């Protein structure tokens, strides 16, 4: 099913790819990508000859009804692996465990170091827990990947994607085997993550923001709420002024 889905995506969207030769023909590797759109996890597997496994929310595989079954079949078809994210710490450990298992099978494991989609198209600080821990626990090479323009195809909240060409740039493998077994050292984890994010930034050309994307989303939500509250307050003041003017005219 993966190949039929991948073939359909390539035919419809005609994604362009650079650096495909950096994906090994065999053996394990970690593909670390920026995350602009829900569709990122579909376009990258579509252009690869090998299966790549990404982590996905368990809800995508357990939703009821016909739509739920179709969604589950689609996610399985493109190589998604369900992980329960209901508990933050437990979810993180489950994702790391799943990633290590994929690598130990000699396969490709895909991960988004930012931990969530970018809220504004910029590249945010990578979280050191997932990517670096899997890399240092296994010694697998890390291949930086940049998704290009996927946020224009399917922005957050948009169900029907826009037909246009996305791009995918694949960088040269990064070797962190010198740190293998040091996945308990938080300074090493931070250093490895930052190096990977720097390579992704060079490939994508994105502006880098040294805060987590989750924090940026909170700031944006708070700013939007403050703007709405201010607008409501202004409307109330205007209504009161209008009422006074009306009474004065009487």
What are these regions (language model features)?
Residues 1-18, 50, 67-78:
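A transmembrane-helix-recognition feature enriched in membrane-embedded lipid enzymes
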Residues 7, 21-22, 44-45, 72-73, ...:
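Short secondary-structure boundary/capping segments
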Residues 10-17, 90-93, 151-152:
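Short gly/ser/thr-rich secondary-structure transition/capping motifs
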Residues 11, 26, 51, 77-78, ...:
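Structured helix-beta-strand junction loops
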Residues 15-20, 40-41, 68, 96-98, ...:
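A generic local structural motif
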Residues 21, 58, 84, 146, ...:
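Residues at the C-termini of beta-strands that transition into short coil/loop
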Residues 23-88:
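Catalytic core of membrane glycerolipid acyltransferases/transacylases, capturing the structured
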Residues 93-250:
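Non-catalytic C-terminal accessory region of glycerolipid acyltransferases
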